[in-house]
């Protein structure tokens, strides 16, 4: 016993070795990491080897993935023309951490007209639906509408309205959402955006008619949920997320069909000067990023 004690004791008889974080079993560390958000897991992985190993454990990251992540991977595999089998094989070789990271990037589907990604802190599903995936009254008549290229859209194109009497934009999506509450927004901009000599310019030339009558926003789901709200469009020069409403998903194993629209069909006056970028779906409580705000 004395020999064993002397091998641990320092020259003054005091313990020369003190347990530290690096002595924690990797399995214990992994159990602690289950209670952290993904960005926090990545930060503590830098502490030492035990934390680094635990931060790569599949069971840690599987707990962060949405319950329908298999559906998401299959959705992406179907997007690859003739390469779906290769993507499925690659996904099987990936660890859960790599799968989480790949799903946090924008993932286009339906021919690139829609995309989804994971909100990195809680792993909730976020979605963006481009103007080209929407049904817009008069979109094929260039007297009324044009598609305008811009860097201010995830899809690099927005639908620009010059002038119209009957304003109606409709869309729908059928998707397997994890159980939870979601918010839906239209991302709109009054004025045509362009760049001149590297500077952002908003042309207000065609803006009119939006202060006379409000725009009606509507949302309905295959489970019978409905919301309706009205709002005047304002804030020229800014991208604004106009809330349409919330919907609840109770069963992630069942596809949820969502229909949404915005209309201003009072034909006593024309309206124009509006950019329609996309429709956004976010987990309730997660605010869409506020970007491209014009300096007034």
Residue ranges of model-derived segments:
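CRL adaptor-proximal regions
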Residues: 1-34
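Residues at structural and domain junctions
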Residues: 17-18, 37, 172, 230
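Basic, Lys/Arg-rich alpha-helical nucleic-acid-recognition elements, primarily the DNA-binding modules
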Residues: 18, 30-31, 35-37, 41-45, ...
């Amino acid at each position: 016993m004395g020999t064993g004690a002397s091998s641990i004791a320092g020259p003054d008889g005091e313990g020369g070795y003190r347990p530290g974080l690096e002595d924690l079993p990797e399995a214990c560390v992994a159990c602690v990491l289950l209670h952290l958000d993904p960005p926090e897991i990545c930060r503590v992985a830098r502490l030492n080897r035990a934390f680094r190993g635990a931060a790569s454990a599949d069971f840690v990251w599987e707990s962060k993935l949405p319950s329908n992540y298999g559906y998401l991977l299959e959705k992406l595999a179907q997007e690859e023309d003739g390469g779906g089998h290769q993507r499925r094989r690659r996904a099987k070789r990936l660890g859960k951490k790599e799968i989480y990271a790949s799903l946090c990037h924008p993932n286009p589907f339906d021919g690139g007209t829609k995309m989804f990604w994971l909100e990195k802190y809680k792993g909730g599903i976020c979605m963006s639906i481009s103007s080209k995936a929407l049904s817009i009254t008069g979109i094929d008549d260039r007297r009324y509408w044009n598609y305008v290229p811009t860097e201010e859209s995830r899809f690099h194109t927005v639908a620009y309205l010059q002038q119209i009497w009957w304003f109606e934009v409709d869309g729908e999506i059928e998707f397997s959402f994890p159980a939870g509450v979601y918010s839906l927004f239209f991302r709109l901009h009054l004025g045509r955006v362009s760049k001149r000599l590297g500077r952002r310019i908003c042309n207000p030339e065609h803006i009119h008619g939006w202060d006379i009558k409000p725009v009606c926003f509507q949302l309905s789901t295959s489970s019978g949920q409905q919301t309706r709200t009205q709002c005047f469009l304002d804030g020229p020069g800014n991208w604004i997320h106009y809330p349409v409403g919330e919907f609840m998903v109770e069963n992630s194993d069942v596809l949820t069909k969502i229909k949404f629209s915005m209309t201003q069909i009072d034909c006593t006056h024309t309206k124009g000067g509006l950019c329609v970028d996309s429709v956004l779906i976010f987990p309730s409580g997660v605010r869409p990023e506020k970007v491209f705000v014009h300096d007034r």
